[in-house]
Amino acid sequence: MVNRRKISIIGAGHTGGTLAFILAQKELGDIVLIERQQSEGMAKGKALDILESGPIWGFDTSVHGSVNIEDIKDSDIVVMTAGIPRKSGMTREELVQTNEQIVRETALQIATYAPHSIIIVLTNPVDVMTYTAFKASGFPKERIIGQSGILDAARYRTFIAQELNVSVKDVNGFVLGGHGDTMLPLINNTHINGIPVKHLISEEKIDQIVERTRKGGAEIVALLGQGSAYYAPATAIYETIDAIFNDRKRLLPSIAYLEGEYGCSDICFGVPTIIGYQGIEKIIEVDMNNDEYQQLQHSAQAVSEVKNSLKFK
């Protein structure tokens, strides 16, 4: 009997459901959508809806919705999207503390039922939640991946392509640091099919693109009026899973646990990584000028301040 690859998605909201649909079409593995008891219908309904699209799209992926965490058993990858969004009147500290508890409990359950899996974290604030999952699960650092960098870089590349009226496929650029206002798009490493972006766009316009990238999530929230982005975040997670299952050795920005890289230790935030079958197989340190390095340290400090507000055992 052939062992089919298994992907469990904890949280069947917009992002989790969209990711399940993408993965099903790509036939990367069988899928389990996990939700809370009170949201059983959402998990099972979305799973069935995706399953029923199989004859049209032409895929044979198994998609199962459940409220039983034990159904993640023997998963190869577990994606953690569970958590609450920031509500009106809620402080950032309250959001962090609430989601930290959710992620901590979930990571312990993953360690129990899927001890050999790779965990991909999307719950916000994602840098600190990735650190929480790392500490709570006890997994080796290469099997804990936070994802924001692919999303942030995709936004950055999109805005550059729009400004230049060129194909987004020809825009290459990386975004490092924390997911938020302190993220660092590497302008000096941004090229359009080999041509440095600084040769094509004014410094003022580049600064505007960088600022728009940093506010990219908030821009979507404002436009939607309710909820947040989910198509692009789900696609970013898909790209990571594809790199793992196909051992592609992709150079992708990921949130990783650092032990001295970029002058940072005991922290998780976005850096260039090689993603393959083992998860994060290598962290790549790129050359930076002094200004970029100082901005990255500022970003690390911002992430550390949130992390230090929590108590880790």
Swiss-Prot record:
Keywords: NAD, Oxidoreductase, Tricarboxylic acid cycle
Catalytic activity: (S)-malate + NAD(+) = oxaloacetate + NADH + H(+)
Residues reported in the UniProt entry to bind substrate: R86, R92, N124, R155
Assigned EC number: 1.1.1.37
Keyword Ribonucleoprotein attributed: no
GO terms, molecular function: L-lactate dehydrogenase activity; L-malate dehydrogenase (NAD+) activity
Binding annotation for NAD(+): G11, A12, G13, H14, T15, G16, N99, L122, T123, N124
Active site (UniProt): H179
One BP annotation, GO: lactate metabolic process
Superkingdom of the source species: Bacteria
Gene3D superfamilies for the chain: Lactate dehydrogenase/glycoside hydrolase, family 4, C-terminal, NAD(P)-binding Rossmann-like Domain
Alphabetized InterPro entries for the sequence: L-lactate/malate_DH (IPR001557), Lactate/malate_DH_C (IPR022383), Lactate/malate_DH_N (IPR001236), Lactate_DH/Glyco_Ohase_4_C (IPR015955), Malate_DH_type3 (IPR011275), NAD(P)-bd_dom_sf (IPR036291)
NCBIfam families xrefs: MalateDH_bact, PRK06223.1
PANTHER family named in the record: L-2-HYDROXYCARBOXYLATE DEHYDROGENASE (NAD(P)(+)), L-LACTATE DEHYDROGENASE
Family stated for the protein in its record: Belongs to the LDH/MDH superfamily. MDH type 3 family.
Cited function: Catalyzes the reversible oxidation of malate to oxaloacetate.
Protein name: Malate dehydrogenase
Gene label: mdh
